[in-house]
Structure formats: C-alpha cells, structure tokens
Regions:
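Helix-rich terminal scaffold detector
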Residues: 1-78
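Active-site phosphate-binding and catalytic loops of NTP-dependent enzymes
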Residues: 80-90
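Short, charged, intrinsically disordered terminal tails
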Residues: 8, 162-167
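Non-DNA-binding regulatory cores of transcription-related proteins
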Residues: 89-153
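Conserved hydrophobic positions within beta-strands
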Residues: 115, 160-162
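Short glycine/proline-centered loop/turn elements that form peptide/ligand docking sites
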Residues: 156
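A broad, low-specificity signal for short, low-complexity segments enriched in glycine/proline
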Residues: 58-66, 73-76, 107-110, 120-123, ...
C-alpha cells in the first residue's frame, strides 16, 4: 500500500485522545442479570479486540482498538467493584434494590419500574438506577405509601400498588 497520503504522526498517535469513561462514586450494586450483562460485555469486547488487533493497520482501526480497550477497562472496573444483590434476599414488604414497583400517578395511570444498578438502567424499558430521583423516592417505601417524584418538568405524586422481586 502506498504511504503517500498517510499522516505518520497521526498514525502513531492513534488512540491517544480517547477519554476514559467516568466511574460512579456510588456503591456498584448490581442484580444477577446486571452482573451477567457486564460479564457478557467483557467477553464481547475481548473478541472484538482480538479481531481488530489481528486485522488493523490503519488509524481508524487503531482508534477503534483504543476505544475498545477503554471500554474494557471500564467494564473490568465495574465487575471488580460489583456488589451483587440477590432479589431473593430482599424483603417483599419494602421497596429495596432489585424491586419491581407498580405505581399509580395522580391521573390514575399505572406504571412499573424496576430498580437496578447504574450500568443496568434503561429508561426505555423502565429500568431505573437506584441513585435516580425516582428510585430515591421509592426506596424504603411500602405498598399503599404515597411518594413525590421530583422531576425538572414538575413533581408527580405516586401511590405504590405492588412490590415484587424477580427470582
């Protein structure tokens, strides 16, 4: 391959400008599902890394390798700091980490939220981080309790209808 258009300095510096992923200051509570997801992600990243290291010679590929290595450092740090919480050990009377909580808002709409670890949170499927304002409002509460969910667009009052834990 002709090297006429290759910026040698840029090629050697590939991956140097990758910013580390921030690690949360909070305890790293994870559900069994969350721990498995992190382990699966670690395996996937290792496979991608092996493939790219065997086939990459260009700057883009070296940048991609640096990104994967960065993500791998993050995932390994999260696995090392993981505090596994088994839902079976939680009180079914109280909203605790790992709970799926069914609530009703002031207009009668019923919603379900699953309180999970920070790396597991996904608002599109109603999995909320245990450090989120919603989870903080729900944690420690019982069925029939009313809580206020403080949101930037306005507070909502929620009544807890049901609490359960996946086994």
């Amino acid at each position: 391959m002709s090297r006429a258009f290759v910026n040698e300095e840029r090629f050697e510096q590939a991956g140097d400008d990758i910013v580390e992923r921030p690690i949360s200051e909070h305890p790293n509570y994870v559900t069994p599902t969350g721990a498995l997801s992190l382990q699966t992600l670690e395996g996937s990243l290792l496979e991608q890394l092996d493939t790219l290291k065997d086939t990459t010679e260009d700057t883009f590929g070296k940048d991609k390798i640096a990104e994967i290595e960065r993500d791998l450092r993050y995932v390994r740090a999260r696995l090392d700091s993981a505090i596994l919480v088994d839902p079976k050990t939680q009180s079914h009377e109280t909203v605790l980490f790992g709970a799926t909580v069914e609530v009703k808002d002031g207009e009668g709409a019923q919603l379900k939220f699953h309180i999970v670890g920070e790396d597991e949170a996904d608002a599109t499927i109603n999995k909320v981080s245990w450090v989120s304002p919603l989870a903080k409002a729900l944690l420690g509460q019982k069925i029939s309790d009313t809580v206020t969910w403080q949101r930037p667009v306005g507070d909502i009052t929620l009544e807890i209808l049901d609490i359960h834990y996946e086994s």
